Amino acid sequence: TYSNSDRDLGNSKSDDQFFEHFHFITKELFRILKPGRIMAVHCMNLPTSKERDGYIGIKDFRGDLIREFQSVGFIYHAEVCIWKNPVTAMQRTKALGLLHKQIKKDSCMSRMGIPDYVVVMRKPGDNPERVTHTNETYPVGHWQEVASPIWEYDYSPVWWDINQSDTLNARAARDGRDERHICPLQLPVIERMLDLYTNEGDTVFTPFMGIGSEVYQAVKMGRRGVGIELKESYFKCACDNMSNLEMERKQISLFDFMDM
């Protein structure tokens, strides 16, 4: 349960109830996406607790999401694993399996940290507007410089270099009444997905806008952004973030007036 609102998907009694609610959304996501285009989902597997689930372990939430998306017609296209610091996770969650004292007590209950994933789904069909690069956007010389790092870096199945704190500021969105969950997505993750799978001028949609990270990065990169957010404090924070971006884009550097 993330909030007391009945509209919150996280306010579900069970996994079955969550996916029953979520199914209405996945069907519409499939409907509005162009054929051959991409939907990227940021997620992680979920730790269980003895009190809530009856056992200590991990739920395959990533796999459940993939199967749900496949059930409405999506093709499982790709995924990337994003490393997270287990020490930071231990300090934040106090998870039994990450505590060093558990190693001394019974290491059979010790586990590794849980990474983030970006699961990439594709809608079947021919893409009516291909995402391509040109000699102008990727000159041969530039390509020769970045070719190896792209495969080792941007296209690696594990991204080691994502700064977990490189997010929009969420502090203003915390209203103190029903706040139990807010985790803004790291901007470099969004940037890489948009660069790989969209063209300038494309419309990028997010059904869970939060404080506006995806819309912010989309507009910053010359795309259009459309987002839906039910919580008023998050929505206001997203509007503030977009206003700040607009102000930044309108600012003119002193060097623009100088002959360098």
Where are these regions (language model features)?
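Core catalytic lobe of class I
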Residues: 1-237
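S-adenosyl-L-methionine
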Residues: 240-260
